[in-house]
From Swiss-Prot:
Periplasmic side: 50-52, 106-295, 353-385, 452-499
Protein family membership: Belongs to the binding-protein-dependent transport system permease family. MalFG subfamily.
Membrane topology: Multi-pass membrane protein
Lineage: Bacteria, Pseudomonadati, Pseudomonadota, Gammaproteobacteria, Enterobacterales
Keyword terms, alphabetized: Cell inner membrane, Cell membrane, Membrane, Sugar transport, Transmembrane, Transmembrane helix, Transport
Ranges where the ABC transmembrane type-1 domain occurs: 297-521
Subunit organization: The complex is composed of two ATP-binding proteins (MalK), two transmembrane proteins (MalG and MalF) and a solute-binding protein (MalE).
Stated name of the protein: Maltose/maltodextrin transport system permease protein MalF
Residue intervals passing through the bilayer: 27-49, 53-70, 83-105, 296-318, 331-352, 386-408, 429-451, 500-522
Main location group: membrane
Amino acid sequence: MKGNIMQLSHTELQSRKKKIAWWQSDALKWLVISLLSLFTCYLIVLMYAQGEYLFAIVTLILVSLGLYVFANRRAYAWRYVYPGVAGMGLFVLFPLICTIAIAFTNYSSTNQLTFERAQSVLLDRQFQTGKTFTFGLYPSDNQWRLQLTNPDDGSLFISEPFSFEATGEQKVMVAPTNTAQTSEPASLRIITQSRQALSSLVAILPDGAELRMSSLRQFSGTKPLYTLGADGKELINQQTGVKYWPNPSTGFYQAVNADGQWENEKLSPGFTVSIGWKNFLRVLHDEGIQKPFISIFIWTILFSVMSVTFTVAVGMVLACVVQWDSLKGKAIYRVMLILPYAVPSFISILIFKGLFNQSFGEINLMLSHLFGIKPAWFSDPITAKSMILIVNTWLGYPYMMILCMGLLKAIPDDLYEASAMDGAGPFQNFFRITFPLLIKPLTPLMIASFAFNFNNFVLIQLLTNGGPDMIGTSTPAGYTDLLVNYTYRVAFEGEGGQDFGLAAAIATLIFILVGALAILNLKASKMNFD
């Protein structure tokens, strides 16, 4: 009996092993995990070698956690949660942390490099000394020869054969010659293609002078413009003797006078340094930033509130109209009213931009014929804001209308029948029955719509580009700019350079403001529901 049981269990075990397909085997799983680990390690090493330490660390953490979750049976339950958590961390938390970190630095178009990299760029600069020779590049078997010509007396120098395959700096001796090369010289295209190799070529004259490529047709005597001081930080100008020190407050190498005071002269490129709360203080105290920031913040709030109000009002009224039982052809009206929602928003915005054209737009042509007026839609702040609200209402009402059409189906007909028996009219039914029953379920969606319009970058960028521009501001700002558009213009359109640190500080303030407004809206909606 026991033998039969053992034989049966052995048979069942064999059959279960046979049922496991090859793509479900542990060997294949570990092979895939091993290959993924090797590929990830390769990517991390590349990121680290290129100086992208932060991205390398984030990639290492996410992939390591992912491999542990999907390879360990104890973490089986986390397999369903980890992709969402990793995505939120990578696309929400990581950019947020980076933005906040940049807000405390002077990171900009003039201060993008690290200190070591900026110092290296400055040390690589050369200045021209001595004579300038024209050159020609001539083939010699499988190598090349460099022929230098002195433009003053026509004397010739020819180099020993060299190859472009050498790495690093390559020194070649040149000797005087009375015979010019008779072979065909290399074309400008070949010289351009080999410019990097020629730039690392050093031609040494018989007197020991060193010549380097200074243009596509010339070799000149050059020397490093700056040399490094004994402390490893000071830079000394070889032409003027001026000494420069790294200024940790500005992120530039600046000249220092005899008293040890900083002078205005500074060297570019600069380097990134931590400046604490200076960017935030600029927003709060610099009048050139404070005035447009406050004005833009107020307009952003008004735009968001009015956009939600208008879209809900128009959408709710149209939903009630197309749901009216006595209306004939309701299906046609529904399709026509929903069409704006089917057209991509950026196409509609550009169409409206043409319609509102002040000189040739159809809207101004019609207003001119009917009323004799031509509003300045793009040059007057009030009319520009009115135009934006009109276009945004057109873009947003179909969504609210669809929601209201669905919610109207949930209202019992008994309520309207009872109100009809009491002698109530359509307006009383709307304000006493329909509106109160629709507004509560719409509240969360209205909050979401408010948050969306608060950061409605595309509408402003395509329709007005923030214009008309404000006068007397230290940063680019317009009357129709939202906070997100203002941040974009500070970061990428500044006349004095792209100030990413200031833009990150404004973006951080926007994040705090939107979060605070969302909390207030949620609390208010909770009180209404209670």
